[in-house]
Amino acid sequence: MMTLTTDKKTMNITEIQSLLPHRYPFLLIDRVTDYEEGKYLIGLKNVSVNEPQFTGHFPQLPVFPGVLILEAMAQATGLLAFKTFGAPKENELYYFASIDEAKFRKPVTPGDQLMVEVEFLKERRGIALFNGVAKVDGDVVCSAQLKCARREF
């Protein structure tokens, strides 16, 4: 799958917020632990019981919603797109375009640390294709193929 570099490039929350428009409670990447432009990005999401989705999903047995795992993958692809293709023009954004072959293998619960790994596959006419895998303690909890598109708004 991914070949990791020995010299790690990272991003803290300040740099992530400078690239993504999302904010709490919808900013789902807390830190980037490694990336290489045009190749891969590894992001981290600390799952806390204090997050608002746990009041209703599910009060007796809190489970991090699968759709939010996919959103974390989409945000990671956006970060990798910025690092690979540069910042969009003032009237452009990277949009989440599609998801295919999403599979959920294990539940994610409060206290888990979600590692989101995305790999750039190809780009054509402003649409980029990525593979995504989310892991907890090294075990795959979700995988999918994602596309993001650079478009004017």
From Swiss-Prot:
Q: What does this protein do?
A: Involved in unsaturated fatty acids biosynthesis. Catalyzes the dehydration of short chain beta-hydroxyacyl-ACPs and long chain saturated and unsaturated beta-hydroxyacyl-ACPs.
**What cellular component terms from Gene Ontology apply here?**
cytoplasm; membrane
Name its cellular compartments: Cytoplasm
Entry's InterPro entries? Answer: FabA_FabZ, FabZ, HotDog_dom_sf
GO terms for biological process, alphabetical: fatty acid biosynthetic process; lipid A biosynthetic process
NCBIfam families, per this entry? Answer: fabZ, PRK00006.1
Its signal peptide is: none
Give the matching SUPFAM superfamilies: Thioesterase/thiol ester dehydrase-isomerase
Matching entries from Gene3D superfamilies are given as:
Hotdog Thioesterase
Reaction catalysed by this enzyme: a (3R)-hydroxyacyl-[ACP] = a (2E)-enoyl-[ACP] + H2O
UniProt-recorded Gene Ontology molecular function terms: (3R)-hydroxyacyl-[acyl-carrier-protein] dehydratase activity
Q: Which residues form the active site?
A: H57
EC annotation? 4.2.1.59
Q: What is this protein called?
A: 3-hydroxyacyl-[acyl-carrier-protein] dehydratase FabZ
The gene is: fabZ
Q: Keyword annotations for this protein?
A: Cytoplasm, Lipid A biosynthesis, Lipid biosynthesis, Lipid metabolism, Lyase
Q: Which family does it belong to?
A: Belongs to the thioester dehydratase family. FabZ subfamily.
